[in-house]
A protein has these predicted regions:
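Conserved SAM-binding loop
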Residues: 1-66, 70-77, 120-121
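Short secondary-structure boundary/hinge segments and terminal tails
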Residues: 64-65, 97-99
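General N-terminal targeting signals
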Residues: 70, 93, 102-104
């Protein structure tokens, strides 16, 4: 059940969300490929409140319902660098190695193992 003290619902096409605290980690799976590039600022500002960021992304040609922003990992590394995030190759590999998310499903559905990325916020 929805508890407003634990969850925040926000439409990032309307602008950034205001957060009044920091977080240890942001876990973002199956999101960025569904958001037009013009709205990246709106969610990146929220992510700046997180010390660590683990995310997935869809690659060009991967396909999927409402995939409007399929990009290679280098794109996300460059974009997130502009918002203060340093890509960690070692933590990305650790994330992919240890994930159990969807590993029992078809290989294409193993989102973290296939296209997981890990970043550290250099400003927190």
């Amino acid at each position: 059940r929805y508890n407003p003290e634990r969850f925040l619902i926000h439409d990032f096409t309307t602008g950034p969300v205001s957060l009044d605290r920091t977080f240890d980690v942001c876990w973002c799976v199956e999101f960025v490929e569904h958001v037009y590039a013009e709205y990246i600022l709106n969610f990146a500002v929220a992510w700046q409140q997180c010390k660590n960021l683990a995310m997935t992304h869809a690659t060009p040609g991967q396909g999927g319902y409402h995939h409007v922003n399929e990009q290679p990992k280098e794109y996300w590394i460059d974009v997130l660098d502009q918002y203060g995030f340093d890509y960690s190759e070692s933590m990305t590999e650790e994330l992919k190695l240890r994930t159990t998310m969807n590993t029992h499903k078809k290989p294409k559905k193993a989102f973290v193992r296939n296209n997981g990325l890990y970043f550290k916020n250099r400003n927190l």
